[in-house]
């Protein structure tokens, strides 16, 4: 998982979610697209 100040969807399967005040990108199709903000 990569940590960025600005997260973006990298494909149409990526989803942006919030957990415990942090924003995440999760992607079932391409797990290397995982990102975290903050």
Curated annotation (Swiss-Prot):
The keyword Methyltransferase does not apply. InterPro entries: Ribosomal_bL36 (IPR000473), Ribosomal_bL36_sp (IPR035977). Keywords: Ribonucleoprotein, Ribosomal protein. One of its GO terms (cellular component) is ribosome. Pfam families: Ribosomal_L36 (PF00444). One of its GO terms (biological process) is translation. It comes from the Bacteria. One of its GO terms (molecular function) is structural constituent of ribosome. Belongs to the bacterial ribosomal protein bL36 family. This is Large ribosomal subunit protein bL36. It comes from Chlorobium phaeobacteroides (strain BS1).
């Amino acid at each position: 998982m990569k940590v960025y100040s600005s997260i973006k969807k990298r494909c149409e399967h990526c989803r942006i979610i919030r957990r415990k005040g942090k924003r995440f990108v999760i992607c079932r199709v391409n797990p290397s697209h995982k990102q975290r903000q903050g």
